[in-house]
């Protein structure tokens, strides 16, 4: 079946399960927009290309799939940079498709030509220029695999205008990705695993630092089992909020700069920190010279480059959070930890953020403990649910994340 490169792109996205695309048209991407009208894809027109990447990022986070954004060459592509960087830093699977000048004009400083692959190299997992219609299907398939594998992140596919306009035979089955062998999802030595087990079972004052990686890996259920099997208190990063029910007594809430002081004090007094899917960001640790000096540290992290980057750890378990926790769970010994948990309650005292377990159904709320959405009654005891909460940045996001009802 002969199709144009633009039609092949639309057909490939449809076969990959894409339903929505966020984009803004322009000269170098117009052939794709012509093809979109004949496809099953729903295009959402944005007012600025930066919005397209942010919307694709949000769509990926909300749906659990890959978000797709589209723009033209030059200023259209450069306008996407902030959204791409956000997706990279927050490990969000986004595929950005940009138009490019015709291949014969590459390198000539043609109208709206820009080296967008060079610009985005530091903020993408992978990017590529496609100058032949025959390569579009395979490249798009590769982009989706890369964006959604390992530590998720953005991929940019830059397609020249002549590749969009050219026609060729389309064979989806033959367009298999040419990628290196898949890495193991667990990649650590048995000695590291045994060291982690020993530290876990010998700790008197353990504390879990829960991050976004728990949700990315779909580890919420096994994480819940792991926490209760070891009776382990949990502090969360901002992006980790939602990985563990706020109604659980072992949930301490958010740590770090915008968290509660008593949570940070508990971290400083712990003798073991178990970091799961988090990167010891400066908003979490503060001054590294004084951060949890008495604590041994276990780091469960899929990205090897994050190990010992900010904080030196005693045991590194490199791999998918869900699979690592599934291996650790049978080896974890239960402890009552009455003294340690009691001490944490004493540290908490009359904190401004109260336990969600004691929240009255119609209690009065302050800005600091606000948990309403559109003026509705506060949610008293949320647990596992598909509820999603979204805020603007700045103070609104912080007051929401430290509120009684955590999402």
Residue ranges and their predicted role:
Residues 1-338, 353, 373, 377-383, ...:
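N-terminal alpha/beta PP-like core and its mobile active-site loop of ThDP/TPP-dependent enzymes
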Residues 9, 32-34, 348-407:
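Active-site diphosphate/adenylate-binding microenvironment
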Residues 338-352:
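Internal, active-site/partner-interface "lid" segment
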């Amino acid at each position: 079946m002969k199709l144009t490169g633009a039609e092949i792109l639309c057909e490939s996205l449809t076969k990959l399960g894409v339903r929505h695309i966020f984009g803004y048209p322009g000269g170098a991407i117009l052939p794709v927009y012509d093809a979109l009208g004949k496809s099953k894809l729903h295009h959402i027109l944005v007012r600025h290309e930066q919005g397209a990447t942010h919307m694709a990022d949000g769509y990926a986070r909300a749906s659990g799939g890959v978000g797709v954004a589209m723009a033209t060459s030059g200023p259209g592509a450069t306008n996407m940079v902030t959204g791409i960087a956000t997706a990279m830093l927050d490990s969000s699977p986004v595929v950005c498709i940009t138009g490019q000048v015709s291949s014969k004009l590459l390198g000539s400083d043609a109208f709206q030509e820009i080296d967008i692959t060079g610009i985005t190299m530091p903020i993408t997992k992978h990017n590529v220029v496609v100058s032949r219609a025959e390569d579009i299907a395979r490249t798009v398939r590769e982009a989706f695999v890369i964006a959604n594998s390992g530590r998720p992140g953005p991929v940019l596919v830059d397609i020249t205008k002549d590749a969009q306009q050219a026609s060729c035979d389309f064979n989806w089955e033959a367009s298999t990705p040419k990628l290196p062998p898949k890495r193991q999802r667990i990649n650590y030595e048995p000695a590291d695993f045994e060291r982690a087990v020993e530290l876990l079972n010998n700790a008197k004052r353990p504390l879990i630092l829960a991050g976004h990686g728990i949700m990315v890996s779909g580890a919420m259920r096994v994480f819940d089992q792991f926490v209760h099997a070891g009776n382990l208190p949990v502090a969360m990063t901002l992006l980790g909020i939602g990985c563990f029910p706020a109604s659980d007594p072992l949930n301490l809430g958010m740590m770090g700069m915008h968290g509660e002081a008593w949570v940070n004090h508990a971290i400083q007094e712990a003798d073991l920190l178990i970091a799961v899917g988090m990167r010891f960001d400066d908003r979490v640790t503060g001054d590294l010279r004084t951060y949890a000096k008495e604590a041994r540290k276990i780091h469960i992290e899929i990205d090897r480059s994050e190990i010992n980057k900010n904080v030196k750890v005693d045991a590194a378990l490199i791999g998918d959070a869900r699979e690592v926790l599934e291996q650790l769970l049978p080896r974890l010994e239960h402890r009552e930890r009455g003294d340690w948990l009691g001490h944490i309650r004493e540290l908490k005292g009359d904190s401004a953020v109260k336990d969600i377990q004691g929240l009255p159904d119609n209690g009065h709320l302050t800005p600091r403990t606000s948990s309403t959405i559109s003026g509705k009654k506060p949610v008293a005891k949320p647990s596992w649910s598909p509820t999603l909460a979204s805020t603007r940045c700045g103070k609104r996001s912080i007051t929401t994340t430290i509120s009684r009802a955590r999402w």
